[in-house]
Amino acid sequence: LSGATMAAGLVAWFGAKGVKRVVERDRPLGYLPDVVIREGDGSGLGYVSGHSAVAATAAVMAMAALPARWRPVPAVVAFLVGIARVVHGVHLPADLVGGWSLGVLIAFAALWLVDRLDRAGTAA
């Protein structure tokens, strides 16, 4: 599952970059000139948050491998990664929702693919 997690994380990162190019929405500085930027220069495209997408992907993949009592931990970490992006002034809340959604979708697709490959290997 670790290899699938790495691959899914890369797909999430590059998927977020692709969505940014299609949507072409600025970061908060483009809409809120008084925003305080705590990281970088606030330039570039904002929707979706790549950090949130990768964090959500990693969280879902980890949740699939963890015992039930530990599953909330990666979800909380992914949530906090997104919140940090808003606090740093580099994303709007909608960017986080988009990133988390993309990440969860990619993780579910990766888990489905891993399951299919495992079943195919068992049947062979």
Protein language model annotation of sequence segments:
Residues 1-15:
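Interfacial segments of alpha-helical transmembrane regions
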Residues 3-5, 29-31, 74-75:
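Short secondary-structure boundary micro-motifs
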Residues 2-3, 20, 71:
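Short, surface-exposed helix-loop/turn micro-motifs enriched in polar/charged residues
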